[in-house]
């Protein structure tokens, strides 16, 4: 009986372990193959790596340089290198992102000439089409007329022609006939009505205003007199000293 109990317990533990292992695999690799393929899609990764804190011998000794390049040629035969001696960095350019990812995973923090090799992905070069979509687009031109002052005319707007100015040609003709000191007949007289004649005369109001308000003359400002102390000092300087010791002022 004890043997049967132990056997059933071991079977339950094995089933529990297998179920836990299956759940972990599903969590890691996804429930189906599509999720796994989506996780393994490396098209968004860059094709270049940066090796930082590279040993100085790589930049100076040809043998060390060839040994360093041999680490990455295993993953891609078309790999190229760009050395930056002042920064102690090397840019490694692969032909595909898969090779760059494999090199980053397998060679990161590995020992090379007594130093740990630090590998980092280079910045992804975004195309112009993708870059334009990542920014906020301006509003449609249909609603731009709401901005004050308007950046563009509203939809359906048409420029209207200015109306022709109204000119009273009769008035212009009458004004052109007027002359200085001449009379002008507005309405001709008839047997029952008198004629209306306009006589141009000088204005009397202008003469009256000149008499009432004569032009003011600007008086010149008088020069102020100097104070008494300055006058006394000037008189003292006018005095002369004679040879005999007497002073004449």
Curated annotation (Swiss-Prot):
Region (Disordered): 1-25, 204-225
Highest taxon of the lineage: Eukaryota
GO terms (BP aspect): calcium-mediated signaling
Skewed-composition ranges (Low complexity): 8-19
Record-level GO cellular component terms: cytoplasm; nucleus
SUPFAM superfamilies according to UniProt: RNA-binding domain, RBD (SSF54928)
Gene3D superfamilies named in the record: 3.30.70.330
An example molecular function term from Gene Ontology annotations: calcium-dependent protein serine/threonine phosphatase regulator activity
Family: Belongs to the RCAN family.
Function recorded in the entry: Inhibits calcineurin-dependent transcriptional responses by binding to the catalytic domain of calcineurin A. Could play a role during central nervous system development.
PANTHER family associated with the record: CALCIPRESSIN, CALCIPRESSIN-3
Protein name per Swiss-Prot or TrEMBL: Calcipressin-3
Organism of derivation: Gallus gallus (Chicken)
């Amino acid at each position: 009986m004890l043997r049967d109990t132990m056997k059933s317990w071991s079977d339950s533990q094995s089933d529990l372990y297998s179920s836990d292992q299956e759940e972990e695999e599903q969590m890691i690799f996804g429930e189906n193959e599509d999720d796994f393929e989506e996780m393994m899609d490396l098209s968004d990764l860059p094709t270049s790596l940066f090796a930082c804190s590279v040993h100085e011998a790589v930049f100076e000794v040809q043998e060390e340089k060839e040994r360093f390049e041999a680490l990455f040629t295993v993953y891609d035969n078309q790999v190229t290198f760009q050395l930056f001696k002042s920064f102690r960095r090397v840019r490694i350019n692969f032909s595909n992102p898969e090779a760059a990812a494999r090199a980053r995973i397998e060679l990161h923090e590995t020992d090379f000439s007594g130093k740990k090799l630090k590998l980092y992905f280079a910045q992804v070069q975004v195309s112009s089409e993708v870059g334009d979509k990542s920014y906020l687009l301006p509003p449609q031109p249909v609603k731009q007329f709401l901005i004050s002052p308007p950046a563009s005319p509203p939809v359906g707007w048409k420029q209207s022609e200015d109306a022709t100015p109204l000119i009273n040609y009769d008035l212009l003709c009458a004004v052109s006939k007027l002359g200085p000191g001449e009379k002008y007949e507005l309405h001709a007289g008839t047997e029952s009505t008198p004629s209306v004649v306009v006589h141009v005369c000088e204005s009397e109001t202008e003469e009256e205003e000149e008499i009432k308000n004569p032009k003011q003359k600007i008086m010149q400002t008088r020069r102020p007199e100097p104070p008494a102390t300055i006058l006394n000092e000037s008189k003292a300087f006018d005095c002369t000293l004679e040879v005999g010791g007497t002073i004449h002022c």
